[in-house]
């Protein structure tokens, strides 16, 4: 909605100088990437949090004398299906593109954008996005390969 409102506010006549400015695929598709991340969050929360909080289908387990819902069972069941593992890994790829653009844009918004610091900021931002997404993707892959029957 924000992207659509911004386009309407600009009108038909472009006011920005765009010649010679290169932009990444991620920067041109932030609305799509944000929508896909929202879709993933809704699926993820529905699959785990709602089942844990309000579902009665999870088996119970006793930990330190306290009976609790077995969330490990839910995670292992979910990540035993290849299509769900692929969905989670692709979602982390979407998150990667979103973060790579978002981190550098955040520094630019704060006014930290010059020839000296920008390449280092982009490198650290890309590295951070890669490590975060690698960590998120590792969980479903590990469950699928090593912990499911």
Map each language-model feature to its residues:
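Membrane-embedded alpha-helical bundles that constitute the cytochrome b-like, heme-associated redox core
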Residues: 1-149
């Amino acid at each position: 909605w924000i992207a659509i409102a911004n386009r309407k506010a600009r009108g038909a006549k472009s006011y920005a100088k765009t010649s010679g400015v290169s932009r990444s695929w991620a920067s041109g598709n932030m609305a799509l990437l944000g929508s896909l991340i929202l879709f993933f969050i809704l699926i993820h929360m529905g699959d785990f949090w709602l089942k844990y909080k309000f579902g009665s289908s999870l088996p119970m387990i006793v930990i330190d004398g306290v009976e609790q819902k077995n969330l490990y069972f839910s995670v292992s069941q979910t990540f035993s299906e290849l299509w769900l593992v692929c969905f989670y890994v692709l979602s982390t790829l979407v998150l990667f593109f979103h973060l790579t653009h978002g981190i550098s844009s955040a520094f630019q918004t704060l006014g930290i954008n010059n020839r000296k610091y920008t390449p280092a900021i982009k490198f650290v931002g890309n590295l951070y996005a890669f490590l975060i997404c690698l960590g998120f993707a590792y969980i479903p892959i590990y469950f699928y390969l090593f912990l499911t029957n």
